[in-house]
A protein has these predicted regions:
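P-loop NTPase Walker A phosphate-binding motif
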Residues: 64-78
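Loop/turn-to-beta-strand initiation segments
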Residues: 78-79, 109-112, 141-147
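Conserved catalytic network of the ASCE P-loop NTPase/AAA+ motor domain
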Residues: 44-46, 75, 105-108, 136-141, ...
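Pre-Walker A (pre-P-loop) alpha-helix and adjacent loop at the N terminus of AAA/AAA+ ATPase modules
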Residues: 8-52
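Walker A/P-loop nucleotide-binding motif
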Residues: 45-66
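Short glycine-rich substrate-engagement loop in P-loop NTPases that contacts/grips substrate
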Residues: 18-31, 55, 74-109, 122
């Protein structure tokens, strides 16, 4: 996580060319996301109760930006837990069947729980129920979350229950990400050297 921070964030990786189905270029979109995070979300983190949902295509900067936020908050002394959705489901099953209250309290009470790659986890009634219960507990305790997903809003509403979607889409600030896959772009650039 050391190199995944705002100092190493390169806005020039994002194209200035607007795609016809989007209102802005990928660079303008990312600038807007960065301006919100650096200008509002992080400065007001201690006093506000904003949950974020980053959604968009793979490689568009969601996970990198999530790491940047985590590092910034950890450096300021906040408690942050970063889990992929799949890892989190395994933890929630552990909590349920092993009565692991220590782990449950950590997940519920941390200042920020980051759930990366929602939609990549194995979905069944138990996993969706446990994930819903955790999100609901955190919302009731005014504990913040950041969720990232490659799913569109339409896909989220098709895959998850109405109750789950109501919490996720009704209680989270939605931030859209789009661009060419930056991971591929960086890998191709590095392989040319």
């Amino acid at each position: 996580m050391r190199y995944k921070n705002f100092d190493n964030f390169d806005i020039n990786l994002f194209s200035n060319s607007k795609k016809e189905d989007e209102l802005f270029s990928p660079r303008k979109n990312m600038e807007d996301n960065l301006n919100y995070i650096l200008g509002t979300y992080l400065p007001e983190f201690k006093t506000s109760n904003v949950n974020l949902l980053f959604y968009g295509n793979p490689g568009s900067g969601k996970s990198f930006l999530s790491y940047c936020i985590a590092k910034e908050l950890l450096d300021k002394g906040f408690g942050v837990i970063y889990k992929t959705a799949d890892e989190l489901i395994q933890d929630l099953i552990n909590i349920r069947f092993n009565n692991n209250t220590t782990l449950e309290n950590m997940l519920v009470d941390c200042d920020l729980l980051i759930i990366d790659d929602l939609g990549a986890e194995q979905k069944n009634e138990l996993s969706v129920t446990e994930l819903f219960n955790l999100i609901n507990k955190k919302l009731l305790k005014n504990k913040r979350m950041l969720v990232s997903t490659n799913l569109s809003i339409a896909d989220i509403t098709k895959i998850y229950s109405e109750r789950f979607c109501s919490r996720l889409l009704g209680e989270f600030k939605l931030r859209k990400f789009f661009s060419d896959d930056i991971r591929i772009k960086l890998n191709l650039k590095n392989n040319k050297k």
